[in-house]
Amino acid sequence: MNWLDYKKKFEPSKKWIISNQSSSGAIFWDEKGKCDPWDHCECLIALAIYEEWEHFWRGVNWFFTNLNEDGLIYAEFQNEKPSKLHYESHHAPYIIMPLIQASLIDEEQDYNKILTNEQLLKLENIFEVLNDFKDEDGYFYWAKDSNGYSDNSLITASMSIFLSLMAKDKSFPKFNIEMWHEKFNRDGVDRSRFSMDFYYPYLAGIKNNNKEFLELLDNYYVKGLGVKCVAEEPWVTIAESSECVISALIHDNENIAKQIFNDIQQFQNKDGIFPTGYQYDMEIFWPEENSTWTNAAVIIAAHALSFYDLGSNNSSVNVFLELRNFFNSN
């Protein structure tokens, strides 16, 4: 399916995102008023793809307004007030992804032309402050609060940081990969059961073994339904499935990417909106919500699929495929 067909098909998802944006620009999780800054940025990528520039820049301005002087943003907002008073290291840097996506779609939307001087300085500060989260081996602590930095690094959060850094600077992050198992999940919690910990290193171009990717995918992929959030749970989630589609495309697993994406189309409801997840043993949608960021992930995956089909000369209109081109050239 080409992008124009997908664009029409997922118009309700885009409208759902816009309907949950406040006048200040915050994009809520759903109609209950919670806002996660990373999810907010994911929604901005989708709005850029749809060229909804008024809503896009309103969301960008909200983000910069809520950055503190240290280039950090609170981990969660409820009804536009901070509700979690710590900072997660991958949140603020992710704003570069929608900014670059906008520039790729329309050069007139180049953030270097549109952001104010103050905002551009804040953007640089985000990445300077990020160094304070980094340990001597190049691994990032996942959070900071009033007591200091968390003595733990998380795979998914770190890979999101790597994505942001590579999108901004077009250079691979330097870290001691031999210390991977020692550095990640130092709290003793095994997070390998989560599909995000499996596919995010591939999404970020840190891992590139296709055989290993497909073998690990078997632990999470339920044919005909999608990708599970947690290996042992009978629960497929639409955002994880969509992100896994992009991860597969980045490493040229086009057939499995299309298969997974086709699987999840059955979950688009009568209003054209996707739920967060589906518990297939109980045959219920769970949780009972239609999250904006889930619908954004579907849009991003559809866009990536459309332009992957057209080859590398056209793939630079999608920020993730643009990164794929960078991975392949290095």
Residues covered by each model-derived region:
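Acidic/His metal-coordination segments adjacent to aromatic residues that form catalytic metal sites
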Residues: 70-85, 141-151, 184, 223-224, ...
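Amphipathic alpha-helical elements of HEAT/ARM-like alpha-solenoid repeat scaffolds that form extended
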Residues: 95-99, 197-205, 245, 299
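Aromatic-rich carbohydrate-recognition surfaces in CAZymes
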Residues: 36-40, 44-136, 155-158, 162, ...
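Alpha-helical junction/boundary sensor with strong preference for TPR arrays
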Residues: 21-24, 67-70, 106, 130, ...
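Structural helix-adjacent loops and short alpha-helical linkers that scaffold large soluble proteins
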Residues: 1-11, 47-61, 99-127, 166-178, ...
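CBM-like carbohydrate-recognition segments
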Residues: 32, 230-240, 246-330
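Extended ligand-binding clefts on enzyme/binding-domain cores
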Residues: 4, 12, 89-90, 113, ...
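Low-complexity, Ser/Thr/Pro/Gly-enriched N-terminal "stalk/linker" regions
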Residues: 1-38, 49-73, 124, 172-175, ...
